[in-house]
């Protein structure tokens, strides 16, 4: 009972403490309300002054409203006038566009009486008034690859500018340094293409007539074209990549002419010797032909190459470039094409090298082959009315 009474007393103490805390909170709330009351008293004192200002503020806002309405009325009229002006301008623009008045301009008659104007008119307009001249200035040197490259862009821009105008079908021509060099370059390229195709076609025809073989003629032309490409590649490597000097445009044209002539000539000589020795068999005939004339053809090619290469010591750089290009082409043609490629192609093709001729891949039988020294045999074979060459050879022996 004593323990229960102590617990009850503790609980009652806590309850009393809670009541006192609540009373303290009410006191604090009262203090805060007192400060709010002070603020409200100050606001109540100011409120009559604010109320007194409201009529003036209302009057000011009414004035602003009237100004806004007046501004709106003014701008409405301006907007209507602007729309009318735009409509008129659009109609006038369409009319001017339909009339194409912008394609010309007006000059007063007095301008044509001016001596200075007449002098300039002769420079920029033709006598009949159907041609006009314009002066274009390059940013760089026109006599350079960069200046020449501007020609196509200028022509394209001029053609684009006259599209949709009465001058759409007019001819546009360019003159000057860059245009002249561009015409020379295009003409040289076109002429070189024609000359190369015509020369190769003519060489092919002549080789077919002489060798009587389509394949052999194609081999000659193909190896000559290969020598041309190799000579130009080696020349570009030496002059432009190693020495840093651009090749002149005429080097290509002159090198083509000489290399076509010399290359086809030497190849024809070698293949003609193949044909002369074909009676001994294809491979044996090639070996004999190379042994008999290979050294002569090689020596001739080396001498010609050395002669042309000596142009490099000339004071004229273009002669040095022409000589070295031809010399490099002859060296490649002599040491690679005629010494290795042409005999190798003939061996690989075999009897098809002489197509459409029919040749024996091996030597003829002893019963079908004449005997005796070569000059005597050739003389007897070419003699007309020869019935039995072997009997005639025996009499010569």
Curated annotation (Swiss-Prot):
> Does the UniProt entry include the keyword rRNA processing?
no
Do you know which InterPro entries this protein is assigned to? Answer: MMPL_dom, Mycobact_MmpL
Question: Which Pfam families does the protein's record reference?
Answer: MMPL
Its domain of life reads Bacteria
Regarding the membrane, this protein is recorded as: Multi-pass membrane protein
Gene Ontology terms, cellular component aspect?
A: plasma membrane
The cysteines covalently paired via disulfide bonds are: none
Q: What is the similarity comment for this entry?
A: Belongs to the resistance-nodulation-cell division (RND) (TC 2.A.6) family. MmpL subfamily.
- Protein name as catalogued: Probable transport protein MmpL6
Species of the source: Mycobacterium tuberculosis (strain CDC 1551 / Oshkosh)
Q: Which gene encodes it?
A: mmpL6
